[in-house]
Swiss-Prot record:
It comes from Arabidopsis thaliana (Mouse-ear cress). This is Probable aminotransferase TAT1. NCBIfam families: tyr_nico_aTase. It holds the Pfam family Aminotran_1_2. The lineage of its organism: Eukaryota, Viridiplantae, Streptophyta, Embryophyta, Tracheophyta. Its EC number is 2.6.1.-. Keywords: Aminotransferase, Pyridoxal phosphate, Transferase. InterPro entries: Aminotransferase_I/II_large (IPR004839), PyrdxlP-dep_Trfase (IPR015424), PyrdxlP-dep_Trfase_major (IPR015421), PyrdxlP-dep_Trfase_small (IPR015422), TyrNic_aminoTrfase (IPR005958).
Length: 449
């Protein structure tokens, strides 16, 4: 029996009306403009565009050096002690329940003990909030600061998630420069010039992603004094504090919390090479209690109350992970990164259109300046990376993704052989696109480019 033969549309569902329903003007809902604006400044959007230019050529396999995740390479695997800490909790059954929004107390105590090793003004467990990775810490703190007309000062270049979340939270973004000629120090006069009565905070990243520098005690003190003068807090991202392979010691911004309130963001993803475990923290460095009296502590707690809490299994393992001596793990990782920096800088000497004036001392990236006048048919850093992906199946990150036009970021947190292959392809690409005119070579030899 054909059931459709007796089917009759109700009188109010005419054919014309059915067609009209495809007209979106009759519907009252729309996708979020905030999400569209925020995602437009994320690094992923650019990386996806670059991947779209790549091919499946098995003779020249894809080399993804645009984003950093050393954990995918066996040589960077975390230590067995760290893994066993989680395994022991898993087998005990003690990590199977929900936890408080701020994190379980043993985890908060472990983080407090860990950060206090380098602090004069100690933090208490109640000053610590456990988050789903450092990224959720960024989101919670920025959302807690958001109010009508408020603006926040972000570094340029920077980790793009700060701008994306500020935009999503309705904060106006103002960018201050990091100065390459001064080893990427913060332009403090520039900060004073752009701040106004609606400025609520400034963000610093130390050790710095993507520049790879480590700020000195004196410079950080000046940062704190500038923040105090402006009446703003300092948000400091210190997730790379265990990824330092240069000579400069790490100084936590919390050392200057007696000058201005400091909110420290951290996590185990970079130091312990376990980004997939998604454990980070917010630590409040504020001996004078300003964050509490201004409502920031309450706002952070309230924002955590409406977000998912971090996995209890890894939280319960934090006392073991942070309490153990991890010197061997850190030393091995940092030694490999330092060797990779030397490798890249040595090979870049053969590529005149890419220059690294300052070797990174930390993190898993290397920034190199693109000398466009030496190249033909290359418009800018984005064009360079798009054509490189298409011709060489090599993905590097254009500086524009970080707020630094005509620079290139190379990920060094990979296996050395991959870097060797990538640099060989990069050299070949640059040679093909190098201008053959005598004037360009003359300018290069005279140091004018």
């Amino acid at each position: 029996m054909n059931h459709n033969s007796n089917l009759v549309l109700p009188s109010h569902q005419t054919e014309t009306q059915t067609q009209d329903e495809t007209d979106i003007s009759v519907w009252r809902f729309r996708g979020s403009d905030n999400a569209a604006k925020a995602s437009s400044v994320t690094m992923r959007v650019i990386v996806y565009k670059l991947f779209d230019e790549c091919s499946l050529d098995v003779k020249k396999p894809l080399l993804p050096l645009a984003h950093g995740d050393p954990s995918v390479y066996p040589c960077y695997r975390t230590s067995i002690l760290v893994e066993n800490a989680v395994v022991d909790v898993l087998r005990s059954g003690k990590g199977n329940s929900y936890g408080p929004a701020a994190g379980i107390l043993p985890a908060r105590q472990a983080v407090a003990d860990y950060v206090n090793r380098d602090l004069t003004n100690k933090v208490k467990p109640n000053d610590v909030f456990i988050t789903v990775g450092c990224n959720q810490g960024i989101e919670v703190v920025l959302q807690s600061l958001a109010r009508p007309n408020a603006n926040i000062l972000l570094p340029r270049p920077s980790y793009p998630h700060y701008e994306a979340r500020a935009v999503y939270s309705g904060l106006e973004v103002r960018k201050f420069d990091l100065l390459p000629e001064k080893e990427w120090e913060i332009d403090l006069p520039g900060i004073e010039a752009m701040a106004d009565e609606n400025t609520v905070a400034m963000v610093i990243i130390n050790p710095n992603n993507p520049c790879g520098n480590v700020y000195s005690y004196d410079h950080l003190k000046k940062v704190a004094e500038t923040a105090k003068k402006l009446g703003i807090m300092v948000i400091t991202d210190e997730v790379y504090c265990q990824t330092i392979f240069g000579d400069k010691p790490f100084v936590p911004m919390g050392e200057f919390s007696s000058i201005t309130p400091v909110i420290t963001l951290g996590g185990i993803s970079k130091g312990w090479i376990v980004p997939g475990w998604r454990i980070g923290w917010i630590a409040l460095n504020d001996p004078r209690g300003i964050l509490k009296s201004t409502g920031m502590v309450q706002s952070i707690q309230q924002n955590l109350d409406i977000t998912p809490d971090a996995t209890t299994i890894v939280q319960a393992a934090l006392p073991e992970i942070l309490g153990k001596a991890n010197k061997e793990l850190f030393a091995k990782k940092n030694s490999m990164l330092k060797q990779n920096v030397e490798l890249v800088c040595d090979r870049l000497k053969e590529i005149p259109c890419l220059v690294c004036n300052k070797k990174p001392e930390s993190c898993t990236y290397l920034l190199t300046k693109l000398k466009l006048p030496l190249l033909e048919d290359i418009e800018d850093d984005m064009d360079f990376c798009m054509k490189l992906a298409k011709e060489e199946n090599l993905v590097l990150l254009p500086g524009v993704a970080l707020g630094l036009k005509n620079w290139i970021r190379i990920t060094i947190g990979v296996e050395a052989q991959m870097l060797e292959d990538a640099l060989e392809r990069l050299n070949g690409f640059c040679k093909r696109h190098l201008k053959k005119t005598e004037s360009s070579f003359q300018a290069l030899s005279n140091g004018k480019i």
